[in-house]
From Swiss-Prot:
Localization (cell): Nucleus; Cytoplasm
Composition skew (Polar residues), residue ranges: 18-28
SUPFAM superfamilies: RNA-binding domain, RBD
Physiological role: RNA-binding protein implicated in the regulation of pre-mRNA alternative splicing. Mediates exon inclusion and/or exclusion in pre-mRNA that are subject to tissue-specific and developmentally regulated alternative splicing. Specifically activates exon 5 inclusion of cardiac isoforms of TNNT2 during heart remodeling at the juvenile to adult transition. Promotes exclusion of both the smooth muscle (SM) and non-muscle (NM) exons in actinin pre-mRNAs. Activates the splicing of MAPT/Tau exon 10.
Domain RRM: 54-135, 141-221, 392-467
Alphabetically ordered keywords of this record: Activator, Cytoplasm, mRNA processing, mRNA splicing, Nucleus, Repeat, RNA-binding
Name under which the protein is recorded: CUGBP Elav-like family member 4
Keyword Manganese annotated: no
Source organism of the structure: Macaca fascicularis
Gene from which this protein is expressed: CELF4
Similarity-based family: Belongs to the CELF/BRUNOL family.
Amino acid sequence: MYIKMATLANGQADNASLSTNGLGSSPGSAGHMNGLSHSPGNPSTIPMKDHDAIKLFIGQIPRNLDEKDLKPLFEEFGKIYELTVLKDRFTGMHKGCAFLTYCERESALKAQSALHEQKTLPGMNRPIQVKPADSESRGDRKLFVGMLNKQQSEDDVRRLFEAFGNIEECTILRGPDGNSKGCAFVKYSSHAEAQAAINALHGSQTMPGASSSLVVKFADTDKERTMRRMQQMAGQMGMFNPMAIPFGAYGAYAQALMQQQAALMASVAQGGYLNPMAAFAAAQMQQMAALNMNGLAAAPMTPTSGGSTPPGITAPAVPSIPSPIGVNGFTGLPPQANGQPAAEAVFANGIHPYPAQSPTAADPLQQAYAGVQQYAGPAYPAAYGQISQAFPQPPPMIPQQQREGPEGCNLFIYHLPQEFGDAELMQMFLPFGFVSFDNPASAQTAIQAMNGFQIGMKRLKVQLKRPKDANRPY
């Protein structure tokens, strides 16, 4: 019996046909692999595998066991087509896992049933893992069928799909009232049969009462459904909008601005006239709120008419609310000479220093406004004073000491975007337990779902935090 085997080391695959009869190599032997001799590759001796053969992932393997050591354990369940121990492509270090493909599908099923979580190899703390690899474990025999006639029964759907192979399951999705939702799941006995049904039926016809043509595709796996839920949740948090990330906190700010604008306009309207300063402030609010609603930082509006507001005044909305004017980490105006912050300088001496970019353009304006006092004071500060009382400063955040879960429950996450904080992390990982998990099962579930999860331009790398006595925590 000849077995195709390969060892992945430094990114290279070494394929050879190995003799398993315990004898040495033939005179024409071309070399050795892992201490075993092999004969020259003869195409007639290369084993063939079933079209629906399953590729198995083997986990919890001692790092001192190679293909030649693992082969006797697995070949009792059938003829092996390929056995590959995974090694680091850079260091050549054994990763403690392997891929195994039998020539026959039944052999893989028997091996999984007999070994998975049933036997612990020497030197390991957990039993061996034998399960379909990710590429095989997806529901590649199970189809989702959409745009069905809601009057169709399971028997009708079976008759539609039975021409392509043996159907193991057929289920129509129904609502609480028992009525069909117009979709179903159909499970074949092999991937090839399911693929044939997709090729023949997807988009081929429109069922009576359906709004579009028939939909036939592979059903999502649990992992894919989890990822979709996470992406939807992350999208609601604004994580995938590159402009919303830095400024998402201003959503409430923008809403407050809109409310304050309405109150301000009502206040000045009661006085029977529109104070120029109040009008400018209201317009400034509207501009900032509109921009913030779109997730963009607001830039102060500069008046263009010569008779309304001095050019140096760029009034923020309310002193009691932090101004969002400051993009990409740049802060606003520096503190003024009289000790008042820049955000309140407009209430102090009336006019900010005007940085003249063009002396010929700026000097006449400065001369024109040199003797102008602050516009009628009461309306502008008074209106803001009334409004700002409704928006008190939030109490200062008291930093809390970081807490850790028990050993084996703490995750270390690489490649986080710089703008991520504890709140964003908690929202992302909350469905799997808590940020520090209280049990290993939740931590492992989070790793499976979130490792490789893409946020913006980066993919998360999530793994168990190493023990405290290790040289580094990750």
